[in-house]
A protein has these predicted regions:
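Conserved catalytic or regulatory cores that recognize and/or transform ribose-phosphate-containing ligands
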Residues: 1-176
Length: 176
């Protein structure tokens, strides 16, 4: 194994991005930046043309389905962290809407690390601080360095995988 291969790291898991659909462009831009820095990301599905043409009843079904799909991604075993893209919206600084707050709560309940792109909004300050949410104040490098420090070396993964494949036998004492 070369020294370069030894230094390579595999991210501990996916970073699930969430936020208001009005920030969809920002969500995708940040996902690309994280991917370029070696962190795999998961983004919400975009609202499609079907949403624009849907009846009110169909729209509720589409929203429910999209929410359920993204919530499953938040709680997935391969997810390491949740990043809320809480950009200013409608004059509200550090906006976190109800779906984003639900995704953060689910992430907390499943032991995921929580990050906020901007600061912690006052209305959720107590909960988010209690949950250990990290405010990035727009500095993605905080998330990148934290997540890469938690990354594992490929040889550690292969040792773990090899170990899982070993059949475990009860210990038999050696006769004297």
């Amino acid at each position: 194994m070369t020294s370069e291969a030894w230094l390579e790291r595999v991210p501990a898991g996916d970073i699930v991005l969430c936020g208001s659909m009005s920030a969809f462009g920002t969500i995708h831009r940040i996902a690309r930046e994280l991917l370029e820095r070696g962190l795999p990301t998961v983004v919400p599905e975009p609202d499609g043309a079907a949403w624009d043409l849907a009846t009110p009843q169909r729209l509720l079904h589409l929203k429910r389905s999209a929410s359920m799909s993204h919530l499953k991604r938040v709680k997935a075993k391969r997810t390491a962290a949740v990043l809320a893209i809480n950009v200013d919206r409608h004059g509200v600084h550090d906006y976190i809407g109800p779906n984003t707050f639900a995704e953060l709560a689910l992430g907390f309940a499943h032991g995921k690390r929580l990050y906020l792109l901007q600061d912690i909004p006052e209305q959720y300050e107590e909960e988010l601080r209690a949950w250990g949410a990290v405010s990035l104040d727009g500095r993605l490098e905080i998330l990148v360095s934290s997540e890469l420090q938690l990354a594992v070396h490929p040889h550690q993964l292969s040792l773990f995988e090899d170990w899982q494949g070993v059949a475990h036998k009860p210990h038999t004492p050696i006769a004297a």
